[in-house]
Amino acid sequence: MTHPPKTPLLDQVIYPADLRKLEDRDLPQLAREVRDEMIDAVSRTGGHLGAGLGVVELTIAIHSVFDTPDDRLIFDVGHQCYPHKILTGRRDRIRTLRQENGLSGFTRRAESEYDPFGAAHSSTSISAGLGMAIAADLDKNDRRVIAVIGDGAMSAGMAYEALNNAGALDARLIVILNDNDMSIAPPTGAMSAYLARLASGRTYMGFRDFGKKLTAYLGKNIDRAITRAVEHARGYVTGGTMFEEMGFYHIGPIDGHSFDHLLPVLRNVRDNARGPVLIHVVTQKGKGYPPAEAAADKYHGVNKFDVITGAQARVKPNAPSYTSVFAEALVQEAALDDKIVGITAAMPNGTGLDKLAEAFPSRCFDVGIAEQHAVTFAAGLAAEGYKPFAALYSTFLQRAYDQVVHDVAIQGLPVRFPIDRAGFVGADGPTHAGSFDTAFLATLPGFVVMAAADEAELKHMVRTAVAYDAGPISFRYPRGEGVGVDMPARGEILQIGKGRIVKEGTKVALLSFGTRLADCLLAAEDLEAAGLSTTVADARFAKPLDHDLIRQLARHHEMLITVEEGSVGGFGSQVMQYLSSEGLLDNGLKIRSLVMPDIWMEQAKPEAMNAHAGLDRAGIVSTVFRALGRGVAVGVAG
């Protein structure tokens, strides 16, 4: 383990007010020290490295020029917020990032007044910033609002909806487009810096304002013509863009690692801008740390790593990950069925669809951060007889719920939804937890909703989804490795709406939906040791429910517990609805539903989160004993 870096200048900066006391010539040294501090911290905690390293100069420049927190600074997604946290009173806790009771890996309103808006999902910053800018106008307050958004987040329609609205409202909003994909040639040399300063200065902005005042007297048609003439005239020097067509004053691109470029432009915009401004800043992911510069994709999100070599800590898995099992099973099926296609929303590696893209590049589509489009795109493919697998994280499927309902479910189109990161996800906290998919999908008529109990079951569900053409079908599975069961050479086609008995008993029935099955089996051992004969069943389906299985468990056991790593309103609620409608609660059946608690659970290790929720072995046993009026006198086996 390396020693923390020496940071004499950073040691003088606790809050941005301290930063604003520094001379401009000191800022490059401060940037080096912030980078060193961030690299050391993330090497100890893991987290998002590349994005933060890429915005060190930009973050320092913004806090140097603007009066934060009175001026509002909003980061889109939040992957790049670590330098911001270091400079806003949280450096003393930066080595608790993403740990239980530690700093969030994203911006969070409850954490600091310097985080005016929380983030973790993409493309929300401009909308939130516009709301704050309009609030400032209504309050007759001259505070500035700055939204920093990456080029990747600009692939989502919500960002353009906000830009369009901001332009129409002529809002006092500053949008900084952080272009770290190098998709647009980076600016170089003094001429680029000069043009950016010129375009952000009083003369050019005054020319634009004069045009606006003139057209106020001449009607809408003349207004549009003169406004476009002004922007196009400026475009000959600075480059015209679609942002100008939306009503934004566009500046850049400028070098996001040069204070000589950043400071004068930001100061000009601060002092002169009266309407919406977009500053195009080009940065490099991983800037200042050679391993991250050389492999930006591998250093976007990292485990703990060696600062000297860049080597990341890897724990040898005991079993393959659920994501890899899904990917391999899908590739296997795709080799046998050329109607199978894969769709991902900017997460090919995270969802495992990169494996499908390698094997069948023409049948795998990365649509960018555009979940709504992804789902309706899949619906169009399904309408033409293809078998689309729209692989999304549970938390991101939420972004496309209307499309799931309107474009897929109502039309009964056979779109397949592999739902990754179901349940607790650990360090990313409540914004990324896969809590709600079972609840919001199982309410939809005609939807088939499955959950894999282990990696072999997941393989069965992939093949089942391939074979099912009667309507939409989903299957959920968690982050991380499987439980180590024997794997079939190929998955089996499951009977729709049928679960399975895993262990027979007579007094207590544990009905699991998903990967809590392993803990149910362990809990059954402890209950048997306490003299309570226990049945364990794997539901497999939340919709359609296995009515025969549920009736059998209800009629032949004193107690029934449903167990799921999902929210209130999910599988357990579906079971309860069926039991009540069939009168199966009328004869004194004791029933309990174990779910994720109805709170926003903070980051921790998934096993700790399951224990807190009562979804682990000990929690299940404790629930049984309490329901039966017995003290927990028998120790739970370790």
UniProtKB/Swiss-Prot annotation:
Its EC number is 2.2.1.7. Mg(2+) binds at residues 151, 180. SMART domains: Transket_pyr (SM00861). It catalyses: D-glyceraldehyde 3-phosphate + pyruvate + H(+) = 1-deoxy-D-xylulose 5-phosphate + CO2. SUPFAM superfamilies: Thiamin diphosphate-binding fold (THDP-binding), TK C-terminal domain-like. GO terms for biological process: 1-deoxy-D-xylulose 5-phosphate biosynthetic process; glyceraldehyde-3-phosphate metabolic process; terpenoid biosynthetic process; thiamine biosynthetic process. Thiamine diphosphate binds at residues 79, 120-122, 152-153, 180, 289, 371. Pathway: Metabolic intermediate biosynthesis; 1-deoxy-D-xylulose 5-phosphate biosynthesis; 1-deoxy-D-xylulose 5-phosphate from D-glyceraldehyde 3-phosphate and pyruvate: step 1/1. Its cofactor is Mg(2+); thiamine diphosphate. Binds 1 Mg(2+) ion per subunit. Belongs to the transketolase family. DXPS subfamily. PANTHER family: 1-D-DEOXYXYLULOSE 5-PHOSPHATE SYNTHASE-RELATED, 1-DEOXY-D-XYLULOSE-5-PHOSPHATE SYNTHASE, CHLOROPLASTIC. Homodimer. NCBIfam families: dxs, PRK05444.2-2. This is 1-deoxy-D-xylulose-5-phosphate synthase. It comes from Rhizobium etli (strain CIAT 652).
